[in-house]
Curated annotation (Swiss-Prot):
This is ECF RNA polymerase sigma factor SigG. One of its GO terms (molecular function) is DNA binding. Disruption phenotype: Not essential, no effect on the SOS response genes, no change in resistance to DNA-damaging agents including mitomycin C. GO terms for cellular component: plasma membrane. Induction: Very poorly expressed in exponential phase; further repressed at room temperature. Up-regulated 10-fold 7 days after infection of human macrophages. Induced by DNA-damaging agents but not by surface stress (detergent). It comes from Mycobacterium tuberculosis (strain ATCC 25618 / H37Rv). Residues 180-232 are annotated as: Sigma-70 factor domain-4. Sigma factors are initiation factors that promote the attachment of RNA polymerase to specific initiation sites and are then released. Extracytoplasmic function (ECF) sigma factors are held in an inactive form by a cognate anti-sigma factor until released, although no anti-sigma factor is known for this protein. May be involved in host intracellular survival after infection (strains H37Rv and CDC 1551). A role in the SOS response is controversial; it has been seen in strain CDC 1551 but not in H37Rv. A motif (Polymerase core binding) lies at residues 85-88. Keywords: DNA-binding, Sigma factor, Transcription, Transcription regulation. InterPro entries: NTF2-like_dom_sf, RNA_pol_sigma-70-like, RNA_pol_sigma-70_dom, RNA_pol_sigma-G_actinobac, RNA_pol_sigma70_ECF_CS, RNA_pol_sigma70_r2, RNA_pol_sigma70_r4_t2, RNA_pol_sigma_r2. The gene is sigG. Residues 63-129 are annotated as: Sigma-70 factor domain-2.
Amino acid sequence: MRTSPMPAKFRSVRVVVITGSVTAAPVRVSETLRRLIDVSVLAENSGREPADERRGDFSAHTEPYRRELLAHCYRMTGSLHDAEDLVQETLLRAWKAYEGFAGKSSLRTWLHRIATNTCLTALEGRRRRPLPTGLGRPSADPSGELVERREVSWLEPLPDVTDDPADPSTIVGNRESVRLAFVAALQHLSPRQRAVLLLRDVLQWKSAEVADAIGTSTVAVNSLLQRARSQLQTVRPSAADRLSAPDSPEAQDLLARYIAAFEAYDIDRLVELFTAEAIWEMPPYTGWYQGAQAIVTLIHQQCPAYSPGDMRLISLIANGQPAAAMYMRAGDVHLPFQLHVLDMAADRVSHVVAFLDTTLFPKFGLPDSL
């Protein structure tokens, strides 16, 4: 195909190039959608339609909302991996529909509407993502055999999405709304209950707006919301169990002592750091353990560390909570081992979820080895 000579005046506009076909399942979507690339296209200054102009600005207009869209999709799915793919699919759908966006709602609202329906489609027929504490009673013997179930789609942690002061979202970026215990509680709701609760109580939408977004009536929305709130009260953290700021001096001091105890392999010091009723769980293992002594027995008996220096940890924030990435000695280096997300009560650790999925480490910007 021959083209006419290129005009003298050009400018660069950003568009999206799609390669391959798109499938519905997020785990397969990523292979295609991650090939979305920004390219520079030369176009004449004159003769461009307003819709083309707006499409050219799509990336600049939508990029500020990527973080909160990720948080929203994560709350809906309980999976960081799926949330990333669903954000990509949301932006793909939005780009295709951008020409028809009339501005009757804000761009932020419009994007969340698309994201919500994208998540609802992806969640059809899927099981909830649990933590071990959601499967039964605590394990009695921390020295016993550990039961691993990698076929289960476990809840995943989320990197901090509130560290950018330029983020336009102050509601969605609230750390309480991505707290691990809250996201785990959301998994007990149906996808539509989850969507209604998040749109009403986190994003502060009106019932009529929610009804319009998910294609139902206001009466149905209010009914779904009532059932969701009622069910959530039985599984969510209590109102008194407030999340302390992970970057507060108190939280940072306790996290530093927690890291120091592990790196020194100081079991006695670890016992002192946990509350009497502290909980330890580590997906993909199904067991969970309660009580400081049970936890340190588990660490002493089951952890592949034997002496000071076998473990190294990096402090970070996950789900708006203090967290630490643990690396285990492997010859002359330390390799990714676990990602710990902590709950703290006063000056003690009350709950640890230790994720053994090392594919999470790059998502948190962590090094391959130490």
